[in-house]
Amino acid sequence: MAINPITRNKIKDYLNSFIQQQLSVYSQRSLREFQDVDSYPSSLSKDGDLKPFHASLIPASIMRLNRFERSLSTGLGSTFEECTRLIALDHHAVALRNYDIQAALDQAQWAAIDQLISTIDRGLKHQTPSLNQMLEQIQSIPLTGILETHIVRADLYIQRHDGSELFFEIKSPKPSKGQCLEVMQRLLRIYTIKQQSAVPVKAFYAMAYNPWGISRASYRSSITKKYTDFSNAVVIGQEFWSLIGEPSTYTELLEIYHEVGLAKSAEITQKLLQ
């Protein structure tokens, strides 16, 4: 079993708390129901959430469910980070969220990273270079002798029992161009900071699941493939969770999410449809 019983209970408690928090936030926001053509459009909303055409067509109960689902989806990414940390603690020596690396590098190295990202952004190359190719460029530039200190934050840091290190940026499996460029910049900065490390270091753009299917070959985001080193920098779904735990980690975690969902379904339905 990749996720031991104690960790399973910790994850369940965390997910239950997450859903309760989402319900609490939702309950504090009222949803204006469409009564008639005159009253709804003339009402005011400080949150800017009036949707007169939606509300006139769709039953209020469905609108409430839709709003809750959107809110839940927004916060779901944070649950992946915490579940990853909890599972990793059972398999590795260290697992930390929001891990900061502070380092002083030559001014030219920081500038070279930014220039590479700018080149990718402007599409000056038909295909994004591999991380290794970009790191070779950074390491080959003339140095200025002027040091600059920067802090780079990783969503998750893992130190394995053999001392090797893993850094993860856990982001959406359907990212924007800007998100891809931001992650690539962080990965390049981490690798450049760690270039003299005595232990193996790997840094990844991690996606908790694949929206197109179970296999890597089924992944279809053209933005990700264009603006990242997809072959070497990106881990998706099961391959990501296998790095955190074991090959069965992904399916075991889905089972936990499903168990919590079943246990909370009646409460969620009652609060949203009342």
Swiss-Prot record:
<keyword id="KW-0540">Nuclease</keyword>
<keyword id="KW-0680">Restriction system</keyword>
<protein>
    <recommendedName>
        <fullName>Type II restriction enzyme HgiBI</fullName>
        <ecNumber>3.1.21.4</ecNumber>
    </recommendedName>
</protein>
<keyword id="KW-0378">Hydrolase</keyword>
<keyword id="KW-0255">Endonuclease</keyword>
<comment type="function">
    <text>This system is less active than isoschizomeric RM.HgiEI.</text>
</comment>
<comment type="similarity">
    <text>Belongs to the TdeIII type II restriction endonuclease family.</text>
</comment>
<dbReference type="GO" id="GO:0003677">
    <property type="term" value="F:DNA binding"/>
</dbReference>
<dbReference type="InterPro" id="IPR019045">
    <property type="entry name" value="Restrct_endonuc_II_TdeIII"/>
</dbReference>
<dbReference type="GO" id="GO:0009307">
    <property type="term" value="P:DNA restriction-modification system"/>
</dbReference>
<dbReference type="GO" id="GO:0009036">
    <property type="term" value="F:type II site-specific deoxyribonuclease activity"/>
</dbReference>
<dbReference type="Pfam" id="PF09520">
    <property type="entry name" value="RE_TdeIII"/>
</dbReference>
